Amino acid sequence: VHWSAEEKQLITSIWGKVNVADCGAEALARLLIVYPWTQRFFSSFGNLSSATAISGNPNVKAHGKKVLTSFGDAVKNLDNIKGTFAQLSELHCDKLHVDPENFRLLGDILVIILAAHFGKDFTPECQAAWQKLVRVVAHALARKYH
């Protein structure tokens, strides 16, 4: 994947302002609420019975932060995203059997959350760079499935 200097700048400038704990929790909660079938991968998380329960669930918050923290590894390693996610791809494929489509859904949700959080700063050019990034990350995570 080739990243232009502008794309890299747009991604890193937004990433530098992201509250990983808040945005991560919000992204995972939104995934579980908007796409309820994804909840089956989180049966050990306790109460996921309603949007309020999901949003307030400490396990959802903790895992959301973990997910977005690892997303930060992609931002730091834009030129080696495949390598960066090789082990996570293996874990999600071989052990957890996560549907790779879920990675794409979560990426799209992350873009929505960034747009909501950053408003006018999240320009169409910025969105394009982030959309490319979440696609590349989703593809890297799904790599073990191919």
Curated annotation (Swiss-Prot):
One of its GO terms (cellular component) is blood microparticle. The keyword Cytoplasm does not apply. Keywords: Heme, Iron, Metal-binding, Oxygen transport, Transport. One of its GO terms (molecular function) is haptoglobin binding. Residues 2-146 form the Globin domain. GO terms for biological process: hydrogen peroxide catabolic process. It comes from the Eukaryota. InterPro entries: Globin (IPR000971), Globin-like_sf (IPR009050), Globin/Proto (IPR012292), Hemoglobin_b (IPR002337), Hemoglobin_oxygen_transport (IPR050056). Pfam families: Globin. Transmembrane segments: none annotated. Red blood cells. Heme b binds at H63, H92. Heterotetramer of two alpha chains and two beta chains. Involved in oxygen transport from the lung to the various peripheral tissues. Belongs to the globin family. This is Hemoglobin subunit beta. It comes from Columba livia (Rock dove).
